[in-house]
């Protein structure tokens, strides 16, 4: 090797090192200037929280950095930092603050008025669509991955799918699935133990199973018995629909964070996830075809798929209307990729978010015997004189479940499945909001995080914010049961100060806020209310005490485990909390 070649390699090495040092420093400088221009307080972090590389390695990197006493470098981008911080970060830095990193600028919002303003300005603060397309774009365009006119179309159609007839399907299948789950717990047939004490060893996976079965029937008309074993794999497939759906949804983070080439050349887990996604897509296309044929024969499946296929799709009609193109347009004149994309979103949201909300609600329920007594009174009143639980009519019973709905609302306040709601400015050049009577301009390509966990634990809006107190919701539930909108009662006054506070918009984000709130809110409520009825008609739930423990000891242990929840796609509980189902009388 010549001296010249040696010098060239040396220069190249120095250049690469300099580039990788200077680039992040320059990025930090640029984003610091942007933060200063907003006039908001700001802090630094060494890594951009939404960097794809960081998302892939942070769970491994964080313990190493912590062990090396370098955790302070990523204080505001470490795993689940905002869930751990709760409202403390806003107490220290203000209701709105910036996080400056080499890769971008993030603005965390914990002010209710600004939260409402941001959610109303959909075009100025759109969702980070690029990220959502990466997660679910494989299945087609959807309400989650669209904006502007396209989003309005998706929202209009998906709103029509969540109808009362569909909610009845959800109600009865939830009663069935929850009753079967309860019987399995009591019989000890949970593949873990043969004892008959009703100890529940796999609450999380059972909640996921229940939610998947319910949403599969409600979305696609496919009923899965609770005790169903491994399904037969159809010819030409590598997985059954249930197997593909379960694996895909359990490993959705791989779709979110991993490049597609890993599906073919990566580790076995990534390859299996790729196979699951491919098979799930093929199964869904087949189900769309079947439902389309049924509609042509005058049959209405009364499911979300059927409702979407009967929607008015101007774009498909512009391309030929109902002139049938088997590749892209259904016989009813609707784009198949649109139906596919939204069906996948229903499956993801109806499975993951409902299951996690139910899991947290059940654990909190078990920890609070006093709350159980209040709920039992309501359940007993509803069930008085009822012999068969399936005789209950959804439209008559659901509005009466005021206190039980309060349990769900309070559980999602303490443990929202999405601790922050992501917005962005992307390439928008005129994004601003009013904060403390001043206009605050947000630069393009910024991430705006509506900090649900921060505002949910703010004692200005929630007295005793760390306390599980469903009664704070009872007044709200009464108003909703009467059909009175919270917006109509903003000046609510009286002795119930909790209820008065609750009517301030932007203080509760468990189901989103504004025009882009969760369209499946009632779906989740119906599913979870029916589950509570089936589980607690004759039983209560208790914490399992370790030898020598009191209830208070077990409560503290369970609460600590809940507080160690971690964010993946949604908030997840990774630690086991033992509870048991026992007869009430």
From Swiss-Prot:
<dbReference type="InterPro" id="IPR036396">
    <property type="entry name" value="Cyt_P450_sf"/>
</dbReference>
<dbReference type="GO" id="GO:0020037">
    <property type="term" value="F:heme binding"/>
</dbReference>
<keyword id="KW-0408">Iron</keyword>
<protein>
    <recommendedName>
        <fullName>Cytochrome P450 monooxygenase AOL_s00215g278</fullName>
        <ecNumber>1.-.-.-</ecNumber>
    </recommendedName>
</protein>
<dbReference type="InterPro" id="IPR050476">
    <property type="entry name" value="Insect_CytP450_Detox"/>
</dbReference>
<keyword id="KW-0560">Oxidoreductase</keyword>
<dbReference type="InterPro" id="IPR001128">
    <property type="entry name" value="Cyt_P450"/>
</dbReference>
<keyword id="KW-0479">Metal-binding</keyword>
<keyword id="KW-0503">Monooxygenase</keyword>
<dbReference type="InterPro" id="IPR002401">
    <property type="entry name" value="Cyt_P450_E_grp-I"/>
</dbReference>
<keyword id="KW-0349">Heme</keyword>
<dbReference type="GO" id="GO:0005506">
    <property type="term" value="F:iron ion binding"/>
</dbReference>
<dbReference type="Pfam" id="PF00067">
    <property type="entry name" value="p450"/>
</dbReference>
<dbReference type="GO" id="GO:0016705">
    <property type="term" value="F:oxidoreductase activity, acting on paired donors, with incorporation or reduction of molecular oxygen"/>
</dbReference>
<comment type="function">
    <text>Cytochrome P450 monooxygenase; part of the gene cluster that mediates the biosynthesis of sesquiterpenyl epoxy-cyclohexenoids (SECs) such as anthrobotrisins and arthrosporols, metabolites that possess a novel hybrid carbon skeleton consisting of a polyketide-derived epoxycyclohexenol combined with a terpenoid-derived monocyclic sesquiterpenol substructure (PKS-PTS hybrid). The SEC pathway plays an important role for fungal soil colonization via decreasing fungal nematode-capturing ability.</text>
</comment>
<comment type="similarity">
    <text>Belongs to the cytochrome P450 family.</text>
</comment>
<dbReference type="GO" id="GO:0004497">
    <property type="term" value="F:monooxygenase activity"/>
</dbReference>
<dbReference type="GO" id="GO:0016114">
    <property type="term" value="P:terpenoid biosynthetic process"/>
</dbReference>
<feature type="binding site" description="axial binding residue">
    <location>
        <position position="518"/>
    </location>
    <ligand>
        <name>heme</name>
    </ligand>
</feature>
<comment type="pathway">
    <text>Secondary metabolite biosynthesis; terpenoid biosynthesis.</text>
</comment>
<dbReference type="InterPro" id="IPR017972">
    <property type="entry name" value="Cyt_P450_CS"/>
</dbReference>
């Amino acid at each position: 090797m010549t001296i010249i070649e040696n010098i060239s390699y040396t220069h190249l090495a120095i250049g690469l090192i300099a580039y990788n040092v200077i680039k992040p420093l320059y990025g930090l400088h640029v984003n610091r200037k942007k933060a200063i221009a907003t006039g908001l307080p700001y802090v630094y972090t060494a890594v951009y929280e939404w960097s794809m590389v960081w998302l892939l390695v942070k769970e491994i990197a964080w313990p190493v950095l912590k062990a090396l006493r370098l955790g302070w470098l990523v204080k505001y981008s470490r795993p689940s930092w905002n869930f751990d911080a709760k409202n403390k970060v806003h107490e220290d830095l203000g209701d709105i603050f910036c996080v400056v990193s080499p890769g971008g600028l993030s603005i965390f919002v914990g002010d209710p008025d600004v939260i409402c303003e941001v959610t109303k300005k959909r075009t100025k603060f759109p969702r980070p669509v690029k990220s959502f397309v990466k997660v679910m774009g494989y299945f087609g365009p959807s309400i989650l991955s669209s904006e502007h006119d396209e989003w309005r179309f998706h929202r209009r159609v998906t709103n029509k799918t969540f109808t009362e007839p569909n909610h009845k399907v959800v109600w009865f299948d939830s009663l069935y699935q929850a009753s079967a789950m309860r019987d399995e717990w009591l019989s000890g047939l949970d593949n873990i133990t043969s004892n008959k004490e009703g100890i529940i060893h796999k609450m999380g996976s059972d909640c996921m199973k229940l939610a998947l079965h319910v949403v599969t029937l409600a979305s696609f008309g496919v009923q899965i018995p609770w005790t169903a074993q491994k399904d037969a794999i159809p010819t030409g497939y590598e997985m059954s629909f249930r197997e593909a759906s379960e694996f895909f949804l359990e490993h959705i983070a791989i779709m979110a964070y991993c490049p597609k080439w890993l599906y073919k050349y990566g580790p076995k887990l990534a390859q299996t996830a790729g196979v699951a996604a491919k098979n799930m897509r093929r199964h869904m296309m087949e189900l769309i075809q079947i439902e389309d044929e049924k509609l042509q024969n005058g049959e209405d499946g009364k499911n979300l798929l059927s409702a979407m296929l009967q929607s008015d799709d101007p774009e498909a009609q512009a391309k030929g209307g109902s002139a049938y193109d088997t590749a892209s347009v259904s016989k009813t004149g609707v784009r198949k990729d649109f139906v596919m994309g939204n069906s996948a979103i229903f499956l993801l949201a109806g499975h993951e978010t409902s299951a996690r909300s139910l899991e947290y609600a059940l654990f909190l329920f078990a920890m609070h015997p006093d709350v159980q007594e209040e709920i039992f009174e309501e359940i007993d009143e509803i069930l008085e004189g009822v012999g068969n639980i399936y005789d209950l009519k959804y439209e008559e019973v659901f509005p009466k479940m005021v206190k039980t709905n309060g349990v769900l609302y309070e559980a999602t306040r303490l443990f929202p499945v999405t601790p922050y709601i992501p917005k962005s400015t992307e390439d928008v050049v005129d994004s601003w909001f009013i904060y403390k009577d001043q206009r605050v301009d947000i630069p393009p390509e910024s991430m705006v995080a509506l900090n649900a966990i921060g505002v949910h634990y703010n004692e200005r809006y929630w007295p005793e914010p760390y306390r599980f107190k469903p009664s704070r919701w009872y007044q709200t539930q009464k108003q909703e049961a009467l059909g009175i909108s919270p917006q109509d009662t903003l000046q609510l006054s009286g002795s119930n100060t909790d209820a008065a506070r609750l009517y301030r918009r932007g203080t509760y984000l468990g189901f989103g806020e504004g025009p882009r709130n969760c369209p499946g809110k009632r779906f989740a409520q119906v599913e979870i209310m029916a589950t509570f009825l089936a589980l607690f008609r004759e039983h209560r739930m208790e914490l399992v005490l370790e030898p020598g423990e009191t209830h208070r000891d077990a409560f503290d242990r369970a609460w600590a485990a809940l507080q160690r929840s971690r964010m993946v796609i949604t908030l997840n509980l990774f630690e086991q909390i033992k509870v048991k189902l026992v007869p009430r009388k």
